[in-house]
Amino acid sequence: MKFVVSRNELGNLIKKIQSVVPQNTPIPVLTHVLIETYNDELVFTATDLTVSTRCVTKAKVYEKGAISIPSKRFFQLVKELTEANLEISSSAGEMAQITSGSSCFRLLSMEKEDFPMLPDIQNALRFSLPAEQLKTMLQRTSFAVSREESRYVLTGVLLAIANGVATIVGTDGKRLAKIDAEVTLDKSFSGEYIIPIKAVEEIIKMCSDEGEATIFLDQDKIAVECDNTLLITKLLSGEFPDFSPVISTESNVKLDLHREELITLLKQVALFTNESSHSVKFSFLPGELTLTANCTKVGEGKVSMAVNYSGELLEIAFNPFFFLDILKHSKDELVSLGISDSYNPGIITDSASGLFVIMPMRLHDD
């Protein structure tokens, strides 16, 4: 194998693939990156056996071939090199040689046959979405995913297909984010796929703001292809909890909130929350919302803003950081908040098909 590639192109490939390589693994070959050349294409592949990524770029190929080399050392070396182009070559049973100007480096390598094969997706069902739309949908839901391994199913994002609509949901049991998009699949088709959060984060990184993303659906895996990058991931096993009762909660009160103003006030009053509970009381009076937090070790914070509310006193407590996460993942000037009482969840919606649920916290007497 022998090829010449632009250092910038190589750097872009490394950025796309390096976070897929596992940091700690008992299987040495998984710390490698597989390098293949075909005609004038250079292909990099990395996997942790759950998430696999394959990236393609242009290169001047003199000899076709394939090797796998230790990714960490190789990535660090490329970062330190200064020449515009690099030459990489190897022969059967020999080390890989990296040449940069007058400098020459050799890395131990392994054969392609030692590297795990990518899962087959040839028979997978597929559909397309604008890459930017898929990226946004995942960004607006993945923040709510559980980071607790004990809640295994909730550590992934749900992709549900039904009636020609793709629904993406993330939840940790205390908050939920949901967004819908129409897709070009037969309305009779339905399926549910729980995507690991690592794969979701990689898909977000690989999706550009232009072009299409193709999604491949299989029984035990899904794949996304975009911008010369293919990601294949195994799915999380288990059944995602039924969230329909939560999102269909009847809201007796619906009001519009100025998003930026509420973000500012929540950041201020959150400084006075108890570190163990993080609770802010929302008090609604005619024309006004007051936010209150107090902590015996810190003091008390109280702020207010004008709202379009005309009922009797209504109080409910929320985690301000969960509320801020929701507000930060909307771009609207106004968001709609629906609540019914102090004990049922608040439902926040915006104009971009986003629906967010936040569970209330216990109200404490001031």
UniProtKB/Swiss-Prot annotation:
GO terms for molecular function: 3'-5' exonuclease activity; DNA binding; DNA-directed DNA polymerase activity. Gene3D superfamilies: 3.70.10.10, DNA Polymerase III, subunit A, domain 2. Keywords: Cytoplasm, DNA replication, DNA-binding, DNA-directed DNA polymerase, Nucleotidyltransferase, Transferase. SUPFAM superfamilies: DNA clamp. GO terms for cellular component: cytoplasm; DNA polymerase III complex. GO terms for biological process: DNA strand elongation involved in DNA replication. InterPro entries: DNA_clamp_sf, DNA_polIII_beta, DNA_polIII_beta_C, DNA_polIII_beta_cen, DNA_polIII_beta_N. The keyword Cytoplasm applies. It is found in: Cytoplasm. The keyword Disulfide bond does not apply. Its main location: cytoplasm. Confers DNA tethering and processivity to DNA polymerases and other proteins. Acts as a clamp, forming a ring around DNA (a reaction catalyzed by the clamp-loading complex) which diffuses in an ATP-independent manner freely and bidirectionally along dsDNA. Initially characterized for its ability to contact the catalytic subunit of DNA polymerase III (Pol III), a complex, multichain enzyme responsible for most of the replicative synthesis in bacteria; Pol III exhibits 3'-5' exonuclease proofreading activity. Forms a ring-shaped head-to-tail homodimer around DNA which binds and tethers DNA polymerases and other proteins to the DNA. The DNA replisome complex has a single clamp-loading complex (3 tau and 1 each of delta, delta', psi and chi subunits) which binds 3 Pol III cores (1 core on the leading strand and 2 on the lagging strand) each with a beta sliding clamp dimer. Additional proteins in the replisome are other copies of gamma, psi and chi, Ssb, DNA helicase and RNA primase. Belongs to the beta sliding clamp family. This is Beta sliding clamp.
